[in-house]
């Protein structure tokens, strides 16, 4: 009789070569992203050129099929097509043009709840991991001057949207300059802030797609900056391949968030032709978050308020 899977048993040892290959691929992929982050003058994504210029030794060692695979993985062709068709735009106009080019449409409920004279921290679930940030710019960017969204730094590769984003490094140490930029934005009364308090893309948990526990820092930021909090619910999902990879990662005990390697694919391919619904809730005064609960408990309460909006979607 076959023994149950044991992380310390024979079956795991048999999977070690695969585990090591996935880990190496993961590191190479994010090295490329870091290299590309330094190519701010580039108007097109060229994976091979980046490797040749920034990592010549790696370029000499990599076989041609590996470079081709990386181009496919990051959707180089599709992303460059988007840049070519939308490069004349910037900020909200770029997000709107990108959505039109990809035939992505939206339904928005409760937009009137965001008042012009308010001082807000808007929070949302994070089902897509990348394109939901772009979607919010397309929907809210014109309505809310000075909108800044705290996002995965992978999106900083889109030059036309840098003015809207504040980057967070989810796979390494956060840059001091980025941390300081986020702090300045929270203190600026002319900026409306938005964040995804889970910090990671939604997962398949307990039979449904949902965020992991929200970070308590969302409450701390709201109180310290005296911003009322607006919960928002984004109805959408990634491909089954994405969730399958995440399930496979957990089964193998891989700690790295290798699902991130599929985010460009989800954004450039899977999102095409999709319709997303956004539901905006009532502002919650920051004074609500008193000492009756810890910041961690308030963060989970806020998460519940977000998902309660689902019934209106």
Residues covered by each model-derived region:
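Structural motif
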Residues: 121-123, 167, 192-196
